[in-house]
Every structure is written in structure tokens, then in C-alpha cells.
Amino acid sequence: MGKVIRSLNRFGKKVGNALTSNTAKKIYSTIGKAADEFLESEIGSAAIDGLVQGSVHSIITGESYGESVKQAVLLNVLGSGEEIPDPLSPGERGIQAKLKELEDEQRNELVRLKYNDKIKEKFEKELEEVYNFYNGEANAEIEDEKQFDILNKAVTSYNKILTEEDLQNRRLATRLQKEIGERTHAETVMVKEYRDKIDALKNAIEVERDGMQEEAIQEIAGMTADVLEAASEEVPLIGAGMATAVATGRAIEGAYKLKKVINALSGIDLTHFTHYENRPSVVSTILEYRAKEIPDNALAVSVLIKERAIQENHKELMHIKNEILPRFKKAMDEEKEIMRDRRQMIHPKVMMKFKIPRAQQPQIHVYSAPWDSDDVFFFHCISHHHANDSFFLGFDLSIDLVHYEDLTAHAHAIGAAQTAAGRTLTEAYREFLNLAISKAFGTQMHTRRLVRSKTVHPIYLGSLHYDISFSDLRGNAQRIVYDDELQMHILRGPIHFQRRAILGALKFGCKVLGDRLDVPLFLRNA
């Protein structure tokens, strides 16, 4: 269990003390009169910005130029119309989630219509039975249907899809790591198809990057969702590599309504089984090698990162199948005996026993302090049920404070075995506010509001799904806490833009681009 409390870094934060510092005096005695006048005039007028601010800031404070302004790119590739929402705006997040759900349903239905026969041949007819049951339930209740059998078939079918996806990704990673001369013809074709997709993605990203303003946080956008879907899927389970409708694992699950049937029959919410993305790692690799060819080993690392997320979902499903369903069946039989009901239906009382509170779902949960809510907010990030892990990430942007802490797991109906380690969310939140209150940088009014906020529970503002593995999510959070350079890039602009940048860096990661500047040459020509 770890805990980190740090002060956030911003551009210009130390400029106020720069002229009187010992480091500044040393700099003044060495850089010459012209540069000295340049520094004083620019700082005095508060006109330092962009590269000028970054370069001069590094000189007058003695810090490395690595902390100066570069181009920061949030590592998500977006379809048209999608934006990172403000974490403190539930309405904004809700509309975006509903639009995405409608788009996914339309795309998944196209996959079912196009590949239905091939999918049934590969994954057997159980998928079709589950889908027919879903449609039957939508039209009229089929009371004599053996609902627990349908539930079992839905879980089994989902397990087959995840197993196949796991296998295909491991195959691709293995083939990418092989020497070119050692690959068979089939392996060479597979690697070439994947490289073609990466090249398409690379070209699109390069076009967007060329159009981006320097020294700005940006999301790389511009490709349609369908093309992105094809380009980001390493090995489609069924269908051509760059087809318009690709039969990915997520598309097959969505087309045959597996998660919806499992939720309708058992009350177990599997919406956290999102589309495990490798796009952040792929985009990071493409940006790193933008001027040269990407080596196969670097691509293999991206595939293995996605593999980690697939295995996380697979372990979760096996936890549901092996641990939860037997308990569910036992509770169902007990309820039928009490009710003296011989029908093959699952009683709603049984479902309610396996419902868990929304605030304990495996998602990123957003809270804010009751007062000064725009500046004081935090994320409670929860892992899959089988892992029973979570962490706290709190921000006070008015005094530039960040607090990270690993927390104890929640005890609920579908969690794994409990371990007595870590503190609760309430304890972490109160310590976070106590530390913010004790800081001397805040105004008197801000301190009063924090004291008032400490006496009540924080405001719950909803939750978001994350599309990467929990370990990668934790890695992104820790990078926000530790990486001063990253902090300086995401903490710029209007306050709502800073919150979006923080959420983007948490969900997707952030890569800082740009080459180091020749500082002596810069000052010589200033």
C-alpha cells in the first residue's frame, strides 16, 4: 500500500522568486548584460510565454530544460464528435455515454447481420439461443424458459469469445517478436496485415500532428470511428482486417447482447467489461518513432499491453463463472423452496442479492468537495471485482496539491476474498482536506471552505469507465503525481480545461513531444 502527497508544478510558478534567488544571481553574473536585460524586461512585464517562458524559466531557476514547454498529446485517438468530458459535469458525461452506446449498437448489429453464419460456426449455436431469448424477453415474457440455463450459456459464450481473443493476441505478439527469417508464410501475412493498419494509423496521426499548434495539449482526431475500429484491432476474430464492420470480440458480444442478458437474469453488472484499448500505447509508439520505421519489438509491447487488459477481463469472467454463479444457483434454489415456486424463472429477490452499489462498481468515480468544488475534487478508481483493489487521487488546484493513496477493498456480494490492508475512502478524503487546510499558500476563504467541507461527505458526481487495465490506470495516476514536466503541461488554460486534461492523462496517458532547445543559441539570437 502506497501514499504520495506532492505539490503540483506549473509554468511560471517559481518566476516570482526567481529574481531574488541565489541561483538567479549566479546566472546574472554569467549570461551577460544583454541577456540580463532581456530576462528582467520579460519577467517584469509578465510576458514570458511558450518557448520563451520555458527556456528562460529553466535558466533563472536552475532547472533542466526538460521542464520547459513542449507539445503534449493525450494518447487517445478519437472518432468524430467525441471529446474528453469535464469530470465535474455529469450531464456532459451522460450525453456522451448515451451517444456512444447508440453508435456501438448500430455497429454491432451490422456485424451480426454480416457475419452471423460464420460467428455461429465458430462459437456454436449458444450465442443464437441467448440472442433469441433476449428478443423474446423484449416482446413477451417466456415464463417456461429455463432462465438459469440461458444465464450459463451467456457466460460460457462470453468466455469462449475472450479465450479466442486472448489466443489471437498472444499469437500476434509472439510473431512480432520472431526474426523475419524465422516466420512462416502465414505468420508473415499476419504481421504484414497488422503493419498495414499501423501505417494507416501513423499517417492519420501525422496529418493531425502537423496541423496541431505547438506547445498545446491536443487530442489526435479526424478519423471516423469505423476506420479506427479496424485499424486498432490487431486480429479481428472474423472478417477482413480493414473491413467497414469488423467482428471484434466486443462487437460479437454486443451483437448477441451477452452482457445485457447476464445483467437481466442475474443482476450482475458487467458494463466494466469495456473495449480494452491498446490505442494509447500504439499512439505513444507511433509518436516516438514518427520519423522512422517502428521496430516489430515496439509493436509487440503494445499488443502485450492490450493482452494484459484482455486477461484482466477473462479472470473477472472466470471469477463470475466459478465463484458467483454457484452461489447464485444456491440462493435461487433456496428462494424457490421458500416461495414454493416450481417455475424455471429467477426470482427478482435473488437478483437483488447480487446487486452492488454504484459507487463500488469497477469504474473511475468522481467526487468533489461541497465547497470550492471547481478546485477541490478527487477520483476513486476501483479495479475488477476479482482483484479487489482501488486507489484515491485527489487534487486541490487552487493551492496545487495532489494526493495519491492505495485504499482497502470493498466487501460486497460479488467481490473476492477480503484483505485487511489500506484505509477507506473517507479516511483518505479527510486527510487530503486536512493537508490542504494546513498549507500556507491558500487564501483564508479557501481554508474556511475546506474546513466546512471536511465536516460532511463529498458530493458524488458519477462515474466513468476506463478502457485500459487497472495496472495501466494506476501507472497513469502515479505519473501525474510524480512527473513534474507532465504536470506543467496539463495544468494550463481555463480551470475546466485543466480538469479535462487531468482526466485525459488518467484514462489514456499523456506523451510530451518536442526536442530540447539549444539554450545558448536561443539566448544569442533573442
From Swiss-Prot:
One of its GO terms (molecular function) is structural molecule activity. GO terms for biological process: symbiont entry into host cell via permeabilization of host membrane. It comes from the Viruses. Pfam families: Orbi_VP5. GO terms for cellular component: viral outer capsid. Residues 1-42 are annotated as: Involved in membrane permeabilization. Keywords: Capsid protein, Outer capsid protein, Viral penetration into host cytoplasm, Viral penetration via permeabilization of host membrane, Virion, Virus entry into host cell. It is found in: Virion. Its main location: virion. VP5 protein is one of the two proteins (with VP2) which constitute the virus particle outer capsid. Acts as a membrane permeabilization protein that mediates release of viral particles from endosomal compartments into the cytoplasm. Permeabilization activity is probably negatively regulated by VP2 and is triggered by endosomal degradation of VP2 and exposure to low pH. Belongs to the orbivirus VP5 family. This is Outer capsid protein VP5. It comes from Bluetongue virus 1 (isolate South Africa). The lineage of its organism: Viruses, Riboviria, Orthornavirae, Duplornaviricota, Resentoviricetes.
